[in-house]
Amino acid sequence: MSALKGHPKGLYLIFATSTAERFSYYGMRAIFILFLTQALLFDKEAAASIYGSYTGLVYLTPLIGGYIADKYWGIRRSVFWGAVMMAVGQFLMFMSASTLNNTELAHWLMYGGLGFLILGNGCFKPTVSSLVGQLYEPGDKRLDAAYTIFYMGVNVGSFAAPLICGYLGDTGDPHDFKWGFLAAGIMTLFTVVLFETQKNKYLFSPSGEAIGIIPDAKREKKEDKADHISHPKMDARTKIRNLIIITVLTAVLLAFFGYIFTGDWISVGIFTACIVFPVLILLDGSLTKIERSRIFVIYIVAFFVIFFWAAYEQAGASLTLFASERTNRDILGWEMPASWFQSFNPLFVVVLAYIMPGVWSFLNKRKMEPSSPTKQAIGLLLLSLGYLFICFGVKDAVPGVKVSMIWLTGLYLDRKSTRLNSSHCS
């Protein structure tokens, strides 16, 4: 409990803001695939494709949103407008679930809602955590505890969201999904109001300077200027060259992925953007050689992390459908909503978060702690074993017979130990 005391009040504002925003995201995710299949009557393949495209863009847009915040907007503006767009998205989802009698309108409202959620997430997610570090002096011993508190808020929101939104929306009646989306929308609106009304009271650096207003790139440039550190500049010829490179690369990738994903232009756009945007950032002439090399290393690590998150995000799609259709959820005569399984992740992380650091500390004292890449490899191995675990449980299942929830619970437990194992690398 002592670790919770002695922190700037701004940390608790960020804690509350992140808790509410993660409630919004995970609440919507808990019921989304069920809404698509049970209310909008998409077949499973189409619903999974929509979910996959949505999730892919949710992970892609922070790359752009972080760049915009760093170069132009600043963190405060990005957090505010990100939350506003997500609130609009959630209320559009509510409207979609309220107009099921008009299928075409419901579909368009759903797609519009997803668009706003994607854009809002891109602005919000990469920026809010950056505020935590700016509340403290470099090297402050309280910083580790501060990030622990911050991520605890993330887990509180992601734990409560499936329970509440699932209770309201995942009832078996397609018309009730709207209440789950409404709850998520209200929490996002709460995020907007809370952050906007309290930011000027609590978000200050130890020196008393307001944080998150000036874009980091401009602030660092001003500091470098004071320290006589120069950054390279792009001349007109370099800008034209970079424009040609990006144009040609985009055209080639669109043609290539268009051939692979015939007719699926969302996937074509996602895969193209996943390559073009990283290249575009590397071509930024204001980057120093050291900054560019660090970004390149991040890209290499990110390539392998993609496989982890591709399997991890099955929680919102195939695993939720499996929970709904193939899992016996009866508990003493009461059937647990399928969406509630998504609360197991944050529940297990709270428990295991106290175990994994001790394991690494134990190994470190004996000079046996593996390197960060090795930890990631172990994490991917554990993730694959988790899916093998559930395969063992369902391999003999016959049509019409549901399997015990112990198999899905075991998979979620393994997934969470996997995530803690990998995330500790950072």
PLM region spans:
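Short amphipathic helix-loop junctions that connect adjacent transmembrane helices
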Residues: 30-46, 317-338
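Hydrophobic core of transmembrane alpha-helices in multi-pass small-molecule transporters
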Residues: 103-124, 399-419
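Central cavity-lining transmembrane alpha-helices of secondary-active solute carriers
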Residues: 52-69, 343-356
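C-terminal ends and interior cores of transmembrane alpha-helices
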Residues: 84-104, 381-400
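Single conserved hydrophobic/aromatic residue that forms the stacking wall/gate
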Residues: 420-425
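Intracellular loop-helix junctions on the cytosolic face of multi-pass helical membrane proteins
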Residues: 1-9, 138-139, 166-320, 324-330, ...
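Glycine-rich segments within core transmembrane alpha-helices of 12-TM secondary carriers
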Residues: 58, 144-163, 185-188, 345
